[in-house]
Amino acid sequence: MSWQAYVDTSLVGTGNVDKAAIFNSEGNSVWAASAGFTVAPNEMAEIVTAYKDKGDANGIKAVQSSGLHVAGDKYIVLKADERSLYGKKGKEGLVIVKTTQAILVTHYPETVQPGAAANTVEQLADYLIGVGY
């Protein structure tokens, strides 16, 4: 399956995500993206930095205080660990998951429950990790 097919079928095609992009793990190469979903280089740099941040003594990462910018919008970060970043802006949100070689950046609309979006993205991430990506 092509990277674009993962975006179109495994993510957006589920109805649990309305926009998605797949980047390499360094965040400097877009492998696939939904039409009109543009994550700027400086926004990807924020995401990569969040993954590199080991957190303070309590495990709190800087991004949990500063928020995260994706596609021109700022999101409050609700979860940040070595694998996943979850963000929210009003009733819509982000699910970002890092695999061995890729970063899945996804957006869900206010009509989708956050848990449904998270399950969709986390399941694809598990699959990609299982096949070496």
Language model segments and positions:
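Non-catalytic interaction/Regulatory regions outside core domains
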Residues: 1-133
